[in-house]
Design a protein with these regions (language model features):
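Hydrophobic or amphipathic alpha-helical targeting/insertion segments
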Residues: 31-35, 177-184, 188-240
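A short, hydrophobic beta-strand element of the alpha/beta-hydrolase
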Residues: 338-340
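Bacterial N-terminal signal peptides that target proteins for export
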Residues: 2-15
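Catalytic-loop region of hydrolases
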Residues: 33-172, 176, 181-192, 197-201, ...
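Gly/Ala-rich beta-loop-alpha elbow adjacent to hydrolase catalytic centers
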Residues: 312-322
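Extended charged low-complexity segments that act as oligomerization/scaffolding linkers
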Residues: 256-260, 302-310, 346-356
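Alpha/beta-hydrolase active-site loop
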Residues: 232-233, 238-257, 263-300
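C-terminal motif of bacterial Sec signal peptides marking the signal peptidase cleavage site
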Residues: 24-27
């Protein structure tokens, strides 16, 4: 039997009990020339950062952060007060990552002890469901990239998290498009929590959502890393700016001062239509990142859709994204789907009945 099929049962367990089995790495390339590791089309890599922290700290530097908790650990994520910025008017990119993970993790799970945090679930609860005194940090590397549609106006953000515990002999990848209108870390408490603990890489994406606040009054934007800058200074790192000329913006400000535009609402790109394809793009970029991390001169691209288990799992709008990704997957990227409370549009002729 195809070894990938053995792991499809694990995808079903993910929905019910969040546990998975093992998987065989196979595939030999008989070609004389090894297959190169090529960055997928329309994707721009923004960088790779190592987050090696194994114990809680302030989380204001890369060295004091990890992939899952941004250096805060179980205790820090459970605190009712968010970590403070050294300069609240000028937060750093690393402070924004830390606080973004803090906010997004707590947004999807009950962070209170009485609700089960730290005993039933949380960074310190292992894959068998056993709670420990561990703070649950997961050191590793994070690759960040953006996806464009060729127009230069689309900015889908992707973050591929590769834990140091990644098992190259049983490679697995979890796709985590964000829920709601959240940014790239929107699935940190669901997809990342499950995948990273099991030594899987996790491909997070905002799927074209996220705030991306553009201030029309001073022409300032968010960069990809969350910091603020003028549109001109941000350049290609501009997260979103309204498609408007300076003359039109000046005229608009005179009539309607102090207005803001948001990426998901005002991009005029209807990002929802691309949720599935954006999720698939994140999967392709994740395979590139894994090959960049573990490839060699002799074997530049050891991982592909044929030998890597890929589970697409998310919640709400993210649940809709993984369903659409599975529907649109024409190349066999996805092996299993876990969609919790997905946004789904039923056919107009469909009906539902209640009863036994």
């Amino acid at each position: 039997m195809n070894p990938k099929l053995n792991r499809l049962a694990a995808a079903a367990k993910l929905a019910a009990a969040m546990s998975a089995g093992a998987f065989l790495l196979s595939a030999c390339n008989n070609d004389d020339e090894p297959e190169p590791n090529t960055l997928p089309a329309n994707i721009t890599q923004q960088g790779m950062t190592s987050y090696p922290a194994a114990a809680p700290a302030a989380g204001n530097t890369a060295a004091t952060q990890d992939l899952l908790t941004a250096g805060l650990g179980r205790t820090g994520l459970g605190l009712a007060t968010a970590p403070a910025y050294a300069d609240p008017l000028n937060p750093t990119a690393l402070e924004l990552r830390r606080n973004g993970i803090y906010a997004n993790y707590r947004a999807l799970v009950d962070p209170t002890i009485s609700g089960g945090y730290g005993s039933l679930y949380g960074p310190n609860v292992d894959v068998a469901g056993t709670a420990s005194s561990s703070e649950g940090l997961v050191p590793g590397r994070e690759y960040v990239a953006t996806l464009d549609d060729g127009s230069g106006n689309k900015r889908v953000v992707m973050a591929v998290q590769i834990p140091d515990s990644f098992n190259t002999a049983a490679p697995c990848l979890v796709l985590g498009p964000s829920s709601g209108s959240r940014g790239v870390y929107g699935a940190i408490g669901s997809a990342s929590e499950w995948g990273l603990k099991r030594g899987c890489a996790v491909a997070l994406t905002d799927a074209g959502k996220g705030v991306g606040l553009y201030d029309l009054s001073d022409d300032t934007v968010n960069r990809i890393d969350g910091t603020r800058a003028t549109r001109a200074a941000a350049g290609g790192l501009n997260f979103f700016a309204a498609n408007i000329t300076d003359a039109a913006r000046t005229a608009y400000n005179a009539l309607f001062p102090n207005r803001l535009a948001l990426k998901q609402v005002h991009s005029q790109l209807n990002p929802e239509k691309d949720w599935g394809n954006d999720t698939l793009a994140a999967a392709r970029y994740a395979l590139f990142a894994l090959n960049d991390r573990y490839g060699s001169v002799d074997v530049p691209a050891p991982f592909n859709a044929g030998n890597t288990l890929v589970i697409a799992g998310s919640v709400s709008n993210g649940g809709a994204a993984v369903l659409r990704a599975a529907e649109q997957d024409s190349s066999g990227l996805i092996d299993g789907v876990v969609a919790s409370e997905p946004v789904a549009e039923m056919p107009t002729a469909a009906s539902a009945a209640q009863g036994w």
